[in-house]
Swiss-Prot record:
GO terms for cellular component: anchoring junction; apical plasma membrane; basolateral plasma membrane; cytoplasm. The gene is Dstyk. Acts as a positive regulator of ERK phosphorylation downstream of fibroblast growth factor-receptor activation. Involved in the regulation of both caspase-dependent apoptosis and caspase-independent cell death. In the skin, it plays a predominant role in suppressing caspase-dependent apoptosis in response to UV stress in a range of dermal cell types. It comes from Mus musculus. Residues 650-904 form the Protein kinase domain. The keyword ATP-binding applies. The active site is at 775 (proton acceptor). One of its GO terms (biological process) is positive regulation of kinase activity. Expressed in brain, heart, skeletal muscle, kidney and lung. Expressed in maturing tubular epithelia, with the most prominent expression in the medulla and the papilla. Expressed in thin ascending limb of the loop of Henle and the distal convoluted tubule. Expressed in all layers of transitional ureteric epithelium and in the ureteric smooth-muscle cells (at protein level). Widely expressed. Highly expressed in many brain regions, including in cerebellum, olfactory, hippocampus and cerebral cortex. GO terms for molecular function: ATP binding; protein serine kinase activity; protein serine/threonine kinase activity; protein serine/threonine/tyrosine kinase activity; protein tyrosine kinase activity. This is Dual serine/threonine and tyrosine protein kinase. Residues 393-429 form a coiled coil. The keyword Cytoplasm applies.
Length: 927
């Protein structure tokens, strides 16, 4: 039911008392700012969740379709992104940590709400009136807490004034209130109190909800806590904290806290860590006067709050300009200083936003680093796997040819070895045969004959004995001939195969294991002639056939002499030359068979790796072109949100210069850094946004280095150019001038060579971090007031694994291979060679060979054909040789910067010493 109360639309900023319109405007501005930045944080979180869902979908075997559109369906419950992990693979570790996601989701879902606690109901009502600037609640009630029955009051925004009873989070009660009966300016007391004699339980539990057309309520809801005797403050705060971010105020009107008040605050602090704003409301009869106590004097209230842990003994209220001040509890005893509530709420809300932005940026940065590391791993896999396969094929072929040579030339040696072995072992074999006890054959002790089947079994066992003993002896001698090959070839091959089978592709893993088994069966077992192996028995199959030709006339008696005779006949029937020929023949046959099986398995492995590498290359492309840039942009937004919250938007000073992609301004002070340079970049399209975001990530990820320009932070200006575009403001260290300007003004030889050393040191550091600058030139080398150099503008800087082969850079500094799209960090060495030409010349004049070029295409064609800067008369021989080495057309012939650096030091020591002794010798000073 609607009440006929007064409208406060025109009075919302001009009410009586110490609240005043200024305080209300500040509060409105603070909560409005929080909502604005919370919206950006919510959008970033939504896009981050969608990013992780897309990652999971694109790299899972099956994925349900994502719901269209935004809203709750798109966001899903907190933590659902990480429930189903990615399958094993390169990106299986990319997921949104559930704890961080839950925390962030809860934060963006909870809007702020001002909660008013207090010593008694009068103080709470009076503080509410001060906040709204109008007399909404009565303040002439009884002071006795025991007689107070104030229910919970909730003030929200609406176009018309309305008062009603409602169960929290449920439904509105149809109940006639006193405020419904007539016009009113102050809500009647009977509507505020709980009628405990009421038979309706819902009426006792209900909140009084007041809807008002008020500027402050348009930004934030206000809840007045009920009387503690009706409901404890801890329970009220617990319910509120589930759905809102409470900004807790505590209204005081006495000089000291009562025992009951201390207990209430002690319980709140025990369960919650929220700071509180303690405000002593003015006495009703002197509402416009201030307290007589000086601010510097500490009241009994202050001491009590220190004892309770809300304030520290050295506590000083943070001033608004201190952006890094953490939200702490405040005590304000001067009524005219109620405006400090805006400072308190600003710090509280800002800290929440900053903490959330930091947590989100940590997730972005961590996953982005994983992407970059995985890109390196994938690039190495693409490069090294084909080389490993080729190496395996080559080594196996060498092993095969070596073993075939052994089989061809060892036949005579093997014959002599067999004859020698037989002669050496003959008596031992005969004795062993005579003393042999047969298995599964019963030999009569009385000398009776046995059947033909038993005789054949006995002969076969004697033959097996001779074969096995002879086999072992021959094998032990033969192994020494080829054992070194097993160590040299098989071990290397097995290690190479082990590296190849580390693939996570199951089919390739099986293929590689099969190949390894083939290798062991074909070479390792056969070469070493392990006893009992199937291969060894096959090699001696012909020996069995020869021995089996032994004949007998009548079934003999099994005696020692008979056993020796059978063994003697078996030994005599062996032909050493035939055995050697048979062994070598089977050896060659087996080698050929194994070689073919190996080659077939290697082709199968190669095919498996080919498919895997194709998928890896596709994934590498996705990481470089889609995943990493998309996540980098989210990271840029979350970090920029953190920076603007902490340090506000920087003020643009005078223009310092313009580049291809942005304008550089002077910025006097930002984030505690002075002075600064501000680079304003308006990305024209998605690609430039992605490049800028990645550049920012690389710069922020780099440790500070004295040869690189520091990046202090970034801010995204959504209203750049009057709202016509969105700009990224990069706030950096400001230096004195660039190298182009320095050379133009004139620098001494020693200074120029020191600049060259500084540049090499900076490039070496970038390379040590896996980055390639790709645009080393005069304008990108800045000088401080001591003319020490720092490298700037990492706009084209990328890790090698993230480079797509795009043609970037400044034409005269671009290495020839840049035009092919296949290059590495040696392009920076080439660019340094050109830069060193300018440094040695002491001038900004273009090399003559480049000056003659009419266009960029003409210049590029000449560079590809080998055109380089000319040698000037002032050049020292060693300097010229260093330039030529650096800009060599073959990247492999360019010196490493670790070699260039000591060469430069040597040149500097020699030339500067010579210059001091003979000023006109060698390089001239351009001063």
């Amino acid at each position: 039911m609607e009440a006929d109360g007064q409208s406060w639309a025109g009075e919302s900023v001009s009410g009586p008392g110490p609240g005043g319109g200024g305080m209300i405007r500040e509060l409105c501005r603070g909560f409005s700012r929080y909502r604005r930045y919370l919206g950006r944080l919510r959008q970033n979180l939504r896009e981050t969740q969608k990013f992780f869902r897309d990652i999971k979908c694109s790299h899972s075997h099956s994925c349900p379709s994502s719901p269209a559109g935004g809203g709750a369906a798109e966001l899903g419950p907190a933590g659902d992104v990480a429930e189903a992990p990615l399958p094993a693979g390169q990106l299986s570790c990319i997921s949104f940590p559930p704890m961080e996601e839950t925390y962030l989701q809860q934060l963006v879902d909870r809007l702020p709400c001002i909660l008013i606690l207090g010593q008694d109901c009068n103080a709470k009502c009076q503080l509410l009136n001060l906040l709204l600037g109008v007399q909404v609640l009565p303040t002439l009630k009884l002071d006795s807490d025991e007689s107070c029955k104030l229910r919970r009051l909730r003030f929200t925004y609406g176009t018309r004034t309305r008062v009603s009873l409602a169960l929290p989070g449920q439904y509105e009660l149809v109940h006639t209130l006193a405020s419904h009966q007539d016009n009113w300016e102050t809500i009647p007391e009977e509507d505020l109190e709980v009628q405990e004699d009421s038979e309706d339980a819902a009426h006792v539990l209900a909140d009084l909800e007041v809807t008002m057309h008020h500027a402050l309520l348009q930004e934030v809801d206000i809840v007045v806590a009920p009387c503690p005797s009706h409901r404890p403050s801890v329970d009220v705060l617990s319910d509120l904290a589930n759905d809102f971010l409470p900004v807790i105020t505590y209204a005081l009107h006495k000089d000291e806290l009562s025992e009951r008040g201390e207990q209430e605050l002690r319980e709140v602090r025990q369960y919650f860590s929220f700071p509180m704003f303690f405000f002593k409301v003015p006495k009703l009869e002197i509402i416009s006067s201030s307290s007589g106590r000086a601010e510097s004097e500490r009241s009994p209230l202050y001491g009590q709050l220190v004892d309770l842990g809300y304030l520290s003994s050295s506590h000083r209220n943070c001033v608004p300009s201190d952006q890094d001040c953490k939200a702490q509890s405040m005590l304000v005893e001067q009524s005219e200083k109620l405006k400090q509530l805006s400072t308190f709420s600003h710090q509280l809300l800002q800290n929440r936003l900053v903490d959330a932005a930091k947590a989100l940026n940590v997730v972005h940065s961590h996953c982005l680093d994983i992407f970059i590391n995985q890109a390196f791993d994938m690039q190495r896999d693409l490069q090294i796997t084909p080389k490993r396969l080729e190496y395996t094929r080559k080594k196996e072929n060498e092993l095969y040819e070596s073993l075939m040579n052994i089989a061809n030339r060892k036949q005579e040696e093997m014959k002599d070895m067999i004859v020698e072995t037989l002669n050496t072992m003959k008596e031992e074999l005969l004795d062993d045969a005579a003393n042999m006890e047969f298995k599964d054959v019963i030999v009569p002790e009385n000398g009776e004959t046995i059947g033909t089947r038993e005789i054949k079994s006995c002969i076969r066992q004697i033959q097996e004995l001779i074969i096995s003993r002879l086999n072992q002896a021959v094998a032990n001698k033969l192994i020494s001939s080829v054992d070194y090959l097993r160590e040299s070839f098989v071990g290397t091959l097995e290690r190479c195969l082990q590296s190849l089978e580390k693939s996570q592709d199951v089919s390739v893993h099986i293929t590689s294991n099969y190949l390894k088994q083939i290798l062991n069966a074909a070479y390792h077992v056969e070469v070493t002639f392990h006893s009992g192996s199937s291969v060894t028995r096959m090699l001696w199959e012909q020996i069995k056939q020869i021995i089996q030709r032994i004949t007998w006339v009548n079934p003999p008696t099994i005696t020692l002499e008979w056993k020796r005779k059978v063994a003697q006949e078996a030994i005599d029937s062996l032909s050493a030359s035939k055995l050697a020929k048979s062994i070598c023949s089977q050896f060659r046959t087996r080698l050929n068979s194994s070689h073919e099986a190996f080659a077939a398995s290697l082709r199968q492995l190669e095919a498996g790796h080919s498919g895997r590498l194709e998928k890896t290359e596709d994934l590498w492309l996705k990481v470089r072109k889609d995943h990493a840039p998309r996540l980098a942009r989210l990271s840029l937004e979350s970090r920029s949100l953190q920076d603007v919250l902490l340090h506000r938007k920087p003020k643009l000073g005078q223009e310092l210069g313009r580049g291809q992609y942005g304008v550089v301004y002077l910025c006097d002070n930002w984030g505690g850094h002075f002075p600064c340079a501000l680079k304003s970049v308006v990305p024209p399209d998605e690609k430039h946004w992605n490049d800028l975001a990645l550049e920012f990530h690389y710069m922020r990820s780099l440790p500070k280095h004295e040869r690189l320009v520091d990046l202090h932070g970034s801010v995204i200006d959504y209203n750049y150019g009057g709202g016509s575009s969105v700009a990224v403001l990069l706030i950096m260290e400001r230096l004195h001038r660039d190298l182009y300007t320095g050379l133009k003004a004139g620098l001494t030889l020693e200074t120029r060579l020191q600049i060259a050393l500084d540049v090499v040191e900076g490039i070496r550091f970038l390379h040590s971090q896996g980055l390639v600058h790709r645009d080393i030139k005069l304008k990108n080398v800045l000088l401080d007031k001591q003319n020490r150099a720092k490298i700037t503008d990492l706009g084209f800087c990328k890790p090698e694994a993230m480079m797509s082969g795009s043609i970037v850079g400044t034409p005269i500094h671009m290495a020839p291979e840049l035009f092919t799209g296949k290059y590495d960090n040696s392009v920076d060495v080439y660019a340094f060679g050109i830069l060193f030409w300018y440094i040695c010349s002491g001038s900004i004049k273009l090399p003559e060979a480049f000056e003659r070029c009419a266009s960029k295409d003409h210049l590029w064609n000449n560079v590809r054909r080998g055109t380089r800067p000319e040698r000037l008369p002032v050049f020292d021989e060693e300097c010229w040789q260093l330039m030529e080495a650096c800009w060599d057309g073959d990247p492999l012939k360019r010196p490493l910067l670790g070699i260039v650096q000591p060469m430069l030091r040597s040149i500097m020591d020699r030339l500067c010493k010579c210059s001091s002794e003979q000023p006109n010798r060698g390089l001239d000073d351009s001063t």
